[in-house]
Curated annotation (Swiss-Prot):
Organism of derivation: Drosophila melanogaster
Name of the protein this chain belongs to: E3 ubiquitin-protein ligase TRIM9
PROSITE patterns, per database record: B302_SPRY (PS50188), COS (PS51262), FN3 (PS50853), ZF_BBOX (PS50119), ZF_RING_1 (PS00518)
Gene: Trim9
Function (record text): E3 ubiquitin-protein ligase activity. During embryonic and larval development, regulates the pattern of axonal projections of class IV nociceptive sensory neurons (C4da) downstream of netrin receptor fra. Regulates fine-scale topography of C4da axon terminals upon neuronal activity. During eye development, consolidates the attachment of R8 photoreceptor growth cones to the target medulla layer, probably downstream of fra.
Domain Fibronectin type-III: 474-567
SUPFAM superfamilies with a match to the protein in the record: B-box zinc-binding domain (SSF57845), Concanavalin A-like lectins/glucanases (SSF49899), Fibronectin type III (SSF49265), RING/U-box (SSF57850)
Amino acid sequence: MEDELRCPTCKQLYANPVLLPCFHALCLGCALDIQTPYSPGSALPGAVNGAGAASAAGHNGLHGNGGGAGGGAAAPVTNPNGPGTRHSSHSSAASTASSNTGSESVTSDQDQSDKVSIFSEADSGVVCCSNTSRPVSYAGTGLLPGVGNVVAPPGAAYCLTCPLCRKLVFFDDGGVRNLPTYRAMEAIVDRFCAREALRCQMCETDPKVASLICEQCEIRYCDACRELTHPARGPLAKHTLVKPRGAAQQRESVCGEHEETLSQYCLSCKAPACGLCIGELRHQAHDVQSINVTCKAQKTELSHNLQQLSEKARSTTEFIQRLKGMSDKVTESCMEFERLVHAQCEALIQAIHDRREYLLEAIRMDKDTKIRILKDQQSNCTGKLQQTTGLIQFCIEALKETDSAAFLQVGSMLINRVTNTDMTWHQEVTNAAPRVSPIVDLTLDDAALARAIDNLNFIQMRAVKDGDERCPAAPMTPTILPSDCSAENNSVTVAWQPPNHSFVEGYVLELDDGSGGEFREVYCGKETICTVDGLHFNSMYNARVKAFNSAGEGEYSELIGLQTAEVAWFTFDPVLSGGAGSGLIFSKNNATVSVEGWEHRVALGSVGFSRGVHYWEFTIDNYTADTDPAFGVARIDVARNKMLGKDEKSFAMYIDRQRSWFQHNSIHERRVEGGITTGSTIGVLLDLERHTLSFLVNEMPQGSVAFRDLYGVFYPAVSINRGVTLTMHTAMDAPKMDYF
């Protein structure tokens, strides 16, 4: 509470507090210090120019409840620039030194931020009288110089700016001494100071209650010590002795004008009054109540409001205590979590140690196996060598035999043994290689584990109550990696980075329609990179991604725009064209096609179009037979064993050496002169903005628009048979047609 009892200017406990019209308080001395003389044309302290509404002062008498001083009544204030009016009042009790001259104060809200106006439309003009028996009236309409359209009260001699709300108050010659004494604040300060047990500072033992304090010496005295140590003579005679705070006597509120007890309260003027005041003209027809009844009602209302505020304060106190308890719990929880992380890391380290022992044991076992195999092979080779050496030595000894009959007895056998040994030696010994490599042909794949260690991190858990099962929170937002995203032809690749501190079960990638329309899901899975094919050409696609887990879905990432190619690049698609059994022969990276049989076969391009303008050409590489190749577009389910245009799924132009026809659903029409030979070019222009199909032969239009009202997805198509070879050229700009 002590902060409420300190002056905003001197920061000390209030001394002789006075009440401003804005209901803020100041020490009387501080108010005297900060009030400034005012004269028309002078600058206002803290005021800025503006265009705010003006406030005109009213007039009336206000009866104060101060010690012997009169007051003035709150007057209604009319805003000349608007319809709003308001009554403002406050208790008035001037000091004994107050003059008999009335004063008028005008308050204004000062807005330092936008510098629009220093006066609010709700501000009021107040007439304050010191000790007068007549109402004081100021009816001036002059503008306050330098403050826009604010009406300056005539006769203003002083002004003061409230240090708290920056409202401006004007006074007459009496200045701030016309302000009422803030008796409630004064009493509260006295009671607050009385708690400090103000004792005499000069008593040697058992200090008595101080009765006076010297303002110059700043020492408290009881009556006995004052007579002994601070006599009122000599230099001490000029010192001022006052009662210490807390020693104020209870004073009865009396009317400053009639010296009568204030027993009534005017609800219209919102001011206390005595019995004589009620009988005067200014309170005629006003609603009047007993001052005790009004005081009791306001105390009851204040008590009720205080009870509600006390409940909130109690709740806030409990909340603060809970926060303090949570601080302790945070420390305890963090210590427990540190122990858990330490234990988990130790478990991981132990798992790595166990795995290391397993891997080392596997290496030792592999070593033992290889050594055993090599020893077995060495033993086998040694045995073979010993047998061969024994045979050689035996043969040498046999060659020493001089008895021909004896040698011939075994000669054939030895020749066969040596020959067989020599033949098998090449297989068993000469070409024999070590059965195992002396080099360990293994390597430790630790890249995945290293990445896992690098990615080892915390995941955010969902906040739960004590005792509830903890589970991961919904994941945070993934981050799209622009450097890893790309667009090629009619496909886009989007890559993203997993969110930090989140448990993710999967991702959802969404694309719009390439025209800023609604998003649709194109991928759902655990990968962090995705390529989407089959998009429109020359379109800007916006992509976004979000993560999800069992707890819910996270927020979408920021958008990334990817532009597909302006013109289409494609080839023939052997699979869409019927596969290996179609009889079509593709070459030059599927750009050239031919066929062996006499039956027409349809070849389709690798992309389908549903939007945009697209153009491609065919070059006739070989045209030796009397046949009619057909060029155009088809749907994906076109009949592949008929000439293009024979069914309702295809739109084509078939042409020979002299002329051409347009054909759809076996209906051919509009013959156009002009055919093809080897080296001719056929151009196909598919305009899905106008939904038309046109053809060109040798870069010249072949008739007018061939087909109209084409909607859906169409694939480039051609049908040929034996004797025709052609090559398709794509990624070409569409020619300008002048017959549209």
